[in-house]
């Protein structure tokens, strides 16, 4: 069990207009989102079971589920005291910065099947959903969004390069992120 009742992440960047124009010219949502001010204040609860055995010739199970909630306490407090919303963003601020408001849950299930004393097959299913709430109701914060590809996902693809369909826009960098993820893969591990 892992319980972290309070996690606070504050991003407050002072950007001069030349730099702002430069990052906007890239037309890259990943870069633009990396330089937006925001606060994530919430907690995380997770349960992890690891029955892995170092022996290659054995079968084992790994399971982890995580639940994360952010912004709910702040939002309810601001509603209770009738704090006025920021007219530019139509949202509440914390320390003058807009804060995220969401709930997110994930499940990671892996089964390790021993084939011999030097090889295994790993079956993996990963699923998650994030639900944006009232203060930022259109999407999860960029760093909390789901994506496929990369070292902790489907390793043969770059991070954020897999997504709906096979759309590729050569004029823009199209990062494929979302609020829902369902991923399954099969991997064979053996010495080279």
Residue ranges and their predicted role:
Residues 2-192:
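C-terminal outer-membrane beta-barrel translocator/porin domains of Gram-negative envelope proteins
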């Amino acid at each position: 069990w892992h319980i972290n009742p309070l996690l606070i992440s504050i991003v407050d960047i002072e950007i001069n207009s030349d730099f702002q124009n430069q990052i906007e010219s890239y037309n890259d949502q990943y870069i633009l989102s990396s330089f937006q001010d925001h606060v994530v204040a919430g907690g995380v609860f997770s349960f992890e079971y690891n029955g892995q055995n170092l022996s290659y010739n054995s079968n084992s199970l790994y399971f982890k589920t995580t639940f994360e909630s952010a912004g709910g306490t702040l939002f309810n407090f601001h509603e209770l005291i009738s704090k006025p919303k920021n007219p530019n963003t139509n949202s509440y601020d914390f320390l003058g910065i807009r804060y995220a408001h969401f709930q997110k849950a994930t499940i990671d299930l892996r089964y390790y099947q021993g084939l011999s004393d030097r090889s295994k097959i790993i079956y993996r299913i990963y699923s998650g959903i994030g639900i944006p709430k009232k203060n930022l109701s259109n999407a999860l914060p960029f760093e909390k969004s789901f994506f496929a590809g990369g070292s902790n996902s489907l390793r043969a693809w770059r991070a954020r390069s897999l997504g709906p369909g096979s759309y590729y826009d050569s004029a823009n960098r199209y990062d494929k992120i979302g609020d829902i993820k369902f991923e399954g893969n099969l991997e064979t591990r053996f010495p080279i």
